[in-house]
Amino acid sequence: MAIELDLQLAVEDQNGLPSAQDFQTWLDKTIPPFQPQAEVTIRIVDSQESHQLNHDYRGKDKPTNVLSFPFEAPPGMEMDLLGDLVICRQVVEQEAIDQDKPLMAHWAHMVVHGSLHLLGYDHIEDDEAEEMESLETEIMQGMGFTDPYLAEKE
């Protein structure tokens, strides 16, 4: 089975979005070293839906790039469902411009970053952030992208 993708496009204009194969490739390069089989939903949303979800689940009054919703199976129930990633198209596109990053690289980074959250990684504490960013960089470079944190390190 490997990694199963459920892609939901909840945006009116789907032009310029990564393909289902792009999303699948990014998941395939990120998740299997940690969990060989998994099902992940990626939902691409507009800023209004992202804003609402970010407000409801994180208490933040603005849209955000990616939200991760890990699935926790009830005790005794074995499931490969890892969770959901909700990615906001407008935020990702604006961040790519603001950070002077190639758009597809930033999309890939959001999938990698969100997937690591689904796998239990976090960046609240400095040591956790360092570990997570290091993994993100390693995965991104393994796919031929540059270090997504390069500008912050300079």
From Swiss-Prot:
This is Endoribonuclease YbeY. It is an enzyme of class 3 (hydrolase). The gene is ybeY. Its cofactor is Zn(2+). One of its GO terms (biological process) is rRNA processing. Keywords: Cytoplasm, Endonuclease, Hydrolase, Metal-binding, Nuclease, Ribosome biogenesis, rRNA processing, Zinc. The keyword Transport does not apply. NCBIfam families: rRNA maturation RNase YbeY (TIGR00043). Binds 1 zinc ion. Belongs to the endoribonuclease YbeY family. GO terms for molecular function: metalloendopeptidase activity; RNA endonuclease activity; zinc ion binding. It comes from the Bacteria. Single strand-specific metallo-endoribonuclease involved in late-stage 70S ribosome quality control and in maturation of the 3' terminus of the 16S rRNA. Zn(2+) binds at residues 113, 117, 123. Its EC number is 3.1.-.-. HAMAP family: Endoribonucl_YbeY (MF_00009). SUPFAM superfamilies: Metalloproteases ('zincins'), catalytic domain. It is found in: Cytoplasm.
